[in-house]
UniProtKB/Swiss-Prot annotation:
Protein name: ATP-dependent Clp protease adapter protein ClpS
Family, as annotated: Belongs to the ClpS family.
Disordered: region residues: 1-20
Record organism: Chromobacterium violaceum (strain ATCC 12472 / DSM 30191 / JCM 1249 / CCUG 213 / NBRC 12614 / NCIMB 9131 / NCTC 9757 / MK)
Subunit structure: Binds to the N-terminal domain of the chaperone ClpA.
Biological role: Involved in the modulation of the specificity of the ClpAP-mediated ATP-dependent protein degradation.
BP GO terms, sorted: protein catabolic process; proteolysis
Gene name as annotated: clpS
SUPFAM superfamilies: ClpS-like (SSF54736)
Record InterPro entries: ClpS, ClpS_core, Ribosomal_bL12_C/ClpS-like
Pfam family membership, one: ClpS
NCBIfam families (UniProt xref): PRK00033.1-2, PRK00033.1-5
Amino acid sequence: MKVDMSTSVKDDAQLEASRVRENPPPMYKVLLLNDDFTPMDFVVQVLQQFFHMNREKATHIMLQVHTQGHGVCGVYTKDVAATKVEQVLQYAKAHQHPLQCVMEEN
């Protein structure tokens, strides 16, 4: 008796693909938090360097951080968000600024 495994593998792949479409990975917001010490220009620089924003958008987000206490830098998968947070925190610390960056589920 001959079994056609290619159909079974194909069906499994289609089933897995449909599961992925039904359940996308959870997304996380990366936020910068306001403080009274980090210069506004440094925040703009961080947004441009780590979140690839143009100066206008980075300035807009920086003003949100300044006036509202926090600003959303972007929305990413968990691993990417965690990496961005760590990069920003290390960069701020290296430049002796207390800038805080956190992530929260979207």
